[in-house]
Amino acid sequence: MRRPMIVLAACALALLPGQPASAAAPWGPLAPPNPFLGPPGAATMHGDAGSSDVTALAGPAAAGAVAAYPLASACPTLLEGSDRLVVALCTAIAGQTPTVYLLDPAAPGPLAASLAALPLTRGSLLGGVYAYLDQVDRLVVVDGTDRLLRIRHERDATGTWRLVSEAFADLGPVLPPGDAVTGLVPDWSGNVWFASGQGVAGFVTAGGQVAALILPAGERVANSISSAPSGQVAVATTHALYELRAAASGVPEIVWRAPYDRGSARKPGQLSWGTGSTPTYFGPRTGADYLTIVDNADGQVHVLVLRSGTGELVCAAPVLGEGGPGSENSPVGVGRSVFVASTYGYPYPALPEGAGPAVPPSAPFTGGMTRVDVDGDGCRVVWENTVRSAAVPRLSTADGLLYTVARVGADHTTPLDGYAFTVLDPETGAVTAAQHLPGTVVDDPLQTAPLITQDGHLLQGTVIGILRVG
């Protein structure tokens, strides 16, 4: 998923019987944890440095109590620290001010408040969405003045929680006027890598020095970025997939570039003309053998699997044949398996600047998900379904289930559509449980990622705050 914050902010103007998940070999392996991140599976929007959208924490599995955090803010970024407190990066409805909230995920329901809040300087509406928790539970984020911030939470003498921001580096000198950072991730050496909308990529060293390069003209970065234990950092632009690394000379360098089919135009349900994927590291040997994205080819789209380190195309497979041919979401990747959800036709109420017209201008949201496995013969489609996923799916290796929120209603969407917490068996793609959530358009997650907490709750950002299941 890319830049859900502005899209969410703009939108602010029954348990079903099923079969239990089938017994299967454990999912994995996952890449080793990044030592400069917080708890694995909960420290980045997509769970980890490799953007796997996989967690080793068990989710609610079935029906549970639903509580709400009504924050009057759109909240796409939900992260949990080692202290079991949640840090949320949101956009306030009033003024669209980026705001950091500190939350207790176990607060009594049905309504809960934040423990502390800290507004950030507003800049480009496209910046400041992706952030992460570092190894001491500080939120690392870039504000509207291009400052790299570290935000810690602490209690004062009265026991009141507060959020404290410290500037670590200024990225302004390496960014063009009007540009904004769209992705952040640490590598395994402690460098903080970033990528900007206008195609600047680089890193900040542990000492605060900034080094950057400019990707080819006309290529924009509309997703976050990912890193692997090998030291490689993956960046997907609107034209190509890259791996970068820090050279011995102390500057970023391109390891390889692989163009993909970006199609002839932006598709309805996507936010830019190109892939909607944050690159996902996965693989059967190290957990980061491969990289995967979904292309934007006209008509049928494809999962592309490339080898990390070389950029060799391992295989490609057509996906989302049962639903809409396009995905704004990052794939889920674990072991030999990739899971993709369609967003084709999803009714985003606003688009980022420069998104361009969609062709066709609109389409029904039919949904659909696909699982693809990589084996010695290439890519193989294991299953497809018609689940209308309205969030980035999250796979739990602890309980062997795939979690999302589904949109409920006709394919031609309306503000009266509902939403359902939905659990799937990743072996078959079958829905094992679903629970309707309260509300209609105000509870639209708009294809943002959920958080599974250490206590087994699932938190999902919405247009006006956060819902908690379990």
Predicted regions span which residues?
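Sequence/structural signature of beta-propeller modules
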Residues: 2-8, 12-120, 126-129, 135-138, ...
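Repeated scaffold domains used in trafficking and secretory/extracellular systems
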Residues: 70-80, 119-135, 172-185, 218-229, ...
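Conserved beta-propeller blade signature
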Residues: 86-88, 138-142, 191-195, 232-235, ...
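Loop/turn-rich, solvent-exposed surfaces of beta-rich toroidal or solenoidal domains
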Residues: 90, 289-295, 328-440
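Structural motif
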Residues: 93-104, 145-157, 198-205, 239-245, ...
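Surface-exposed loop and turn segments in beta-propeller and other repeat-based domains
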Residues: 114-123, 162-177, 253-272, 316-324, ...
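Asp-box/WD-like beta-propeller blade repeats and closely related beta-sheet repeat scaffolds
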Residues: 115-127, 145-147, 152-189, 196, ...
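Blade-level signature of beta-propeller repeat domains, shared across WD40, Kelch, NHL, RCC1
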Residues: 444-470
